Amino acid sequence: MVLLQIIASQSYSIEVDEHSSLGNIFDLLSDQGILPKNAKSLHAFYYHGTRLNMNMTCADYGIIHDSAVHIAPLPSSCDIDFKDYSTSAFHLHFSPLTPNHASTEAVSNFKQSSTIPSISKSNLTNPPLESEKSSDKALLTRPATSRRRCCHPTCTRITLRLAGNCLHCNGRFCAAHRLMEDHDCVALFSLRKEEHERNRIKLEKEHGDTLISKV
């Protein structure tokens, strides 16, 4: 049995078998009401910045006791409110991404406004005039789709291409929020913890080598 730390804004706890699949862990959290029933299609587990396969197990990825595993929504998922289950043993912190509503509004406006003129027998016998052709082209012209906006909840600025993509939470951010500290990335806590652990091991090793050399 292993105890995993899943990083976001709230915490839960659950003991899982290291040979159980990650998909079964999703089902277990769904049964407790922490995640929705369709959580597998909306969220994914991440370990060291790599998205985990739902059919693999913790042992396959080398996830040991007290490892830091992240849960983050997929780019197409919506905001989800988690309930509080203090009896479980699985630390879960969740910071949902803000969905982009601009593109959906543009598509709905296009469906309501754009119409295709019908073809009658008179149109087949009498070719349309130049003025009619230009008006038909105007009706068939689709409105320009809006560019993607920053995933930060309080920002509506345009995202940076490539440089604004976060590899840890799959978010797309503007110049002001592209750094992990600026958009409160879900992986920031675990990365700092791993760096602290590496520094601790390095200092302990250097201290031990110093004592051996003095002896």
From Swiss-Prot:
The record's GO CC annotations read:
cytoplasm; cytosol; nucleus
Polar residues: bias regions: 116-128
| Residues holding Zn(2+) 2 | C166, C169, H183, C185
GO molecular function terms noted in the UniProt entry: zinc ion binding
Q: Mainly localized where?
A: cytoplasm
Which residues of this UniProt protein bind Zn(2+) 1? C150, C155, C174, H177
What segment(s) does the record annotate as region Disordered? Answer: 116-138
UniProt keyword annotations, A-Z: Cytoplasm, Metal-binding, Nucleus, Zinc, Zinc-finger
- A Gene Ontology biological process term: SRP-dependent cotranslational protein targeting to membrane, translocation
Query: In which compartments does the protein localize?
Result: Cytoplasm; Nucleus
The family database entries (Pfam families) matched by this protein are listed as:
zf-AN1 (PF01428)
Q: What is the lineage of its organism?
A: Eukaryota, Fungi, Dikarya, Ascomycota, Taphrinomycotina
Identify this protein by name. AN1-type zinc finger protein C1271.05c
UniProt zinc finger (AN1-type) residues:
144-193
